[in-house]
A protein has these predicted regions:
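Polybasic/polar functional segments that serve as interface/processing modules
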Residues: 1-115
Length: 115
């Protein structure tokens, strides 16, 4: 789990994002579409079209951070609000990254084998 700094908010970018993007273009999306400051220390979470891949970006005061996670099975649960950003708690982010429905936590699917 990514340690969320005290006072940092977690923002989910609704809709789909091109997962070929890196930190610079995701930061530009945060700035232009979400109207937030990508260097604020807050975490911004994006998902791909198939909903099995997410990317998180944040600036920790020393540099830009990019985290990527792909689920082996299942899909990331995402809000259906279009064109906006939704804020969630750090606990909900932990559920989200574990493949658990962060709105109604249940047991996660675990991989049974590697390869």
């Amino acid at each position: 789990m990514i340690p969320v700094p005290t006072g940092a908010r977690v923002w989910l970018a609704t809709g789909y994002t091109d997962m070929r993007r890196g930190f610079p273009s995701l930061a530009l999306q945060v700035q232009e579409v979400l109207r937030k400051d990508p260097l604020s220390g807050h975490l911004f979470v994006f998902r791909g079209r198939r909903s099995d891949l997410v990317k998180l970006i944040w600036h920790d005061g020393q540099g830009a951070c990019l985290f990527t996670k792909r689920l082996e099975r299942g899909r990331f649960i995402w809000p259906s609000v279009a064109g906006e950003a939704v804020t969630i708690s750090s606990a909900q982010l932990s559920y989200l990254l574990s493949g658990i429905d962060w709105r109604n936590p249940q047991e996660a699917l675990r991989p049974t084998r590697v390869g």
